[in-house]
Amino acid sequence: MKTAILTFQFAHNYGALLQAYALKQYLKSHDLEGEIAPYYPDWAQSEYAISPFAKGISFRRRVRLASQYWKRKGQSEVFDKFISEELDAGDTFSSELELKKWLETHECVICGSDQIWNNNITGNGGAYFAVDCNVKKISYAASLGTTQLNETQKSNIINYLPSFSSISVREPGSAEQLTKILHREIQVVLDPVFLLDRDEWRKLSRPVSVDSNYLFLYFLQENEKLLECAKKYAEENGLKIYEVHPTLATRHNGCKRLENVGPKEFIWLIENGSCVCTNSFHATAFSTIFRKKLIHIPNSKSPERTTSLLERVGIELKTDKEFPFYDISLCDDTNLNFEIEKSKKFLDAVMESEQYGN
């Protein structure tokens, strides 16, 4: 069955690209042709622009991009290479009309994963609901990004989701909200990165030349307390601190920032670090997959994304530590394996239903 995947395949963001890769690979392993929609809306092109001559950006940002261009160029090219080679993203388009036409060349569209239904990111349109498309629609691990729905989100849910044959989301709080509004069953499933096992991720990963004993630091939101925790843990355990940022926007004293790190290197750095310190959802997810020691404070904009994940897979905070520490290496895999199988069964069942019209 020719299946479209509607997600954030354009983002210069480790988690966004790796979840898209995982869903595409999982479908491929089940003999389903999963093709990622090459939709690259104008807001996203502006968001991820590195050229000072890009459209739709302010004068102040043009000046900043001009000063940063050569520093960011190599990092940007690493992401573009992954998008081209691993996601098979072809020529992009930006209009919703072109998206509609493209989706309708497929038998089914999977909306998700990532925060595709967070209108604070995507704007107020219905593109990521595949609105007005004459095609079968399901969602897999879509995220609203919050449990406090705004009026636009409520309106989108009421107007666009009834046409979906099956709906699954990533966070339990989102499922509760959708159930109240739609009065139908909403499944909670894990992010697509959990559809692939450790060995599959190891095959994709690429080594980085670093010291063998290190703490891996990855922030998408500045957090002074979390940084202090990382430095204290590293000092107590004789670890060097390596950090990455997808746009090279930050650099912290006492940390070695690595540049030109793509999604493949990101996986390797998490698996091989002695400890991971992060407020990122996907860095937390990969720390779970690779059973790492984890120092974690949730992102304040959407804390449920990580707290619900850790709770569902039975990972508890170590209360005997001075900082928010989780030793996933000591955790039982029972809950995680149960959630993974539940997620796979949902996806397998809905795809079979769409394929054979059950």
Which residue ranges define each predicted feature?
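Active-site anion-handling motifs in enzyme catalytic cores
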Residues: 1-358
